[in-house]
């Protein structure tokens, strides 16, 4: 039905535009009168094929390529994703529009002191910590942040929020070998309502991922008023802006030095926070909606 039935239903209902929000379109929609748009989030399965099973890569490649070829317009969630669509699928640049994503509005306003006390007690969060949020997998590279922690004063901790995976086992082996059990806190199953407080209690946010389509956790951190240290190599500079600090994902010493710079220079930290919060405003839901609506209007001219 998703392949053939959707198009028949769209034509029956006399729909003007179909927008595929997650990388795919009905295969026959280009043969209909219905205009189509597809949003492509990333092509990580082509950029880093080693992280995917071959059958999944083949399915994704076929579906994503067909969607890009058949769509009237393509929305990429970053300039990085746009470049990948051009490189891997040979799509003309003028067919692709970049529309950045935002984050949930719960990250855009301060949590109460009572909520901070409640969350700190509930999860036994340390007084001074660097935060990492995201799925705990090889590509996300959280181990590098743990390694960098060994170069920092003992009172500084690392909190990693994410679901337990095989890669978590690798991190935990390093923690045990380096006697970091008291300084690294891996926390799973955090309710979304508690997540903004994790950010606002943190002193630094680190996102050492090797590759992302965009990087919403960075936007969450900027809105939350904490400085960001992120990896080079994909789109994270687009999310973090010019005042965050970027290091190569394998540069452990560089990451540790970035943390030290922030901790040792309160004025720089203040500037990073203030400019980061200003930069984050460009990712509002209102702006995203306006840009998508303009694409719809242009398509109907």
Where do the model's predicted regions map?
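Carbohydrate transferase catalytic cores enriched for Leloir-type hexosyltransferases
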Residues: 1-301
């Amino acid at each position: 039905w998703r392949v053939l039935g959707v198009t028949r239903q769209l034509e029956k209902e006399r729909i003007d535009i179909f927008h595929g929000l997650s990388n795919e379109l009905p295969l026959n929609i280009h043969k209909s009168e219905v205009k189509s748009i597809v949003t492509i989030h990333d092509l990580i399965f082509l950029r880093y094929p080693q992280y995917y099973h071959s059958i999944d890569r083949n399915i994704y490649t076929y579906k994503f390529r067909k969607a890009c070829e058949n769509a009237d317009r393509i929305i990429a969630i970053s300039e990085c994703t746009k470049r990948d669509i051009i490189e891997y699928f040979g799509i003309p640049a003028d067919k692709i529009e970049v529309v950045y994503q935002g984050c949930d509005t719960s990250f855009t306003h301060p949590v109460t002191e009572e909520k901070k006390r409640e969350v700190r007690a509930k999860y036994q969060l340390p007084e001074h910590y660097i935060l990492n949020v995201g799925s705990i997998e090889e590509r996300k590279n959280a181990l590098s942040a743990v390694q960098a922690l060994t170069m920092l004063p003992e009172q500084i901790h690392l909190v990693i929020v994410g679901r337990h995976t095989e890669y978590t086992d690798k991190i935990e082996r390093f923690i045990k070998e380096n006697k970091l059990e008291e300084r690294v806190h891996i926390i799973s199953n955090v309710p979304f309502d508690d997540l903004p407080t994790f950010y606002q209690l943190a002193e630094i946010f680190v996102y050492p991922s090797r590759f992302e389509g965009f990087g919403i956790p960075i936007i969450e951190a900027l809105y939350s008023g904490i400085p960001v240290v992120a990896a080079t190599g994909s789109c994270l500079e687009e999310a973090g802006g010019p005042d965050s600090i970027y290091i190569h994902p394998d540069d452990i010493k560089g990451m540790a030095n970035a943390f030290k710079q922030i901790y040792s220079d309160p004025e720089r930290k203040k500037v990073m926070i203030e400019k980061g919060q200003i930069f984050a405003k460009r990712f509002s839901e209102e702006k995203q909606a306006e840009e998508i609506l303009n694409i719809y209007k242009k398509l109907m001219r």
